[in-house]
């Protein structure tokens, strides 16, 4: 019997593989992206201390209107502003195993425009 591969399991496997090579420090934390069917979530994480330094998501009150891509742009802007306010200017971008396209790319571009370097 032919079975269809589970896209999320493949993404999780890809994410685990990339996370083995990618890590955030206090000087250059990791900007992690998680994308669900309804929302998008971004966190700036110091992996050495195991602490989230800044975060933003579509659950925030500032991000209620628009298409999913427009919401991703607002989330990118918010996470960048919150990170810059805490003195973080450079990050390592972790796309979470997703393709660098669509909502993930929109979030990354908005974060770059608002002061994060990666």
UniProtKB/Swiss-Prot annotation:
Protein name: Large ribosomal subunit protein uL18
General function of this protein: This is one of the proteins that bind and probably mediate the attachment of the 5S RNA into the large ribosomal subunit, where it forms part of the central protuberance.
Keyword match Transmembrane: no
Listed GO CC annotations: cytosolic large ribosomal subunit
UniProt source species: Streptococcus sanguinis (strain SK36)
Region (Disordered): 1-24
InterPro entries: Ribosomal_uL18_bac-type, Ribosomal_uL18_bac/euk
Name of the coding gene: rplR
Coiled coil, from the record: none
NCBIfam families: L18_bact (TIGR00060)
Stated family: Belongs to the universal ribosomal protein uL18 family.
Biological processes, Gene Ontology terms: translation
Sequence intervals crossing the membrane: none
């Amino acid at each position: 019997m032919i079975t269809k591969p589970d896209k999320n399991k493949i993404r999780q496997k890809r994410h685990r593989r990339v996370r083995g090579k990618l890590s955030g420090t206090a000087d250059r934390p990791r900007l992690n992206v998680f994308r669900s069917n309804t929302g998008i979530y971004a966190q700036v994480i110091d992996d050495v201390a195991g602490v989230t330094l800044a975060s933003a998501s579509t659950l925030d009150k500032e991000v209620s209107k628009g298409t999913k891509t427009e919401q991703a742009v607002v989330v990118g802007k918010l996470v960048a502003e919150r990170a810059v306010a805490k003195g973080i200017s450079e990050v390592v971008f972790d796309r979470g195993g997703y393709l660098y396209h669509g909502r993930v790319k929109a979030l990354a571009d908005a974060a770059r425009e608002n002061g994060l370097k990666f």
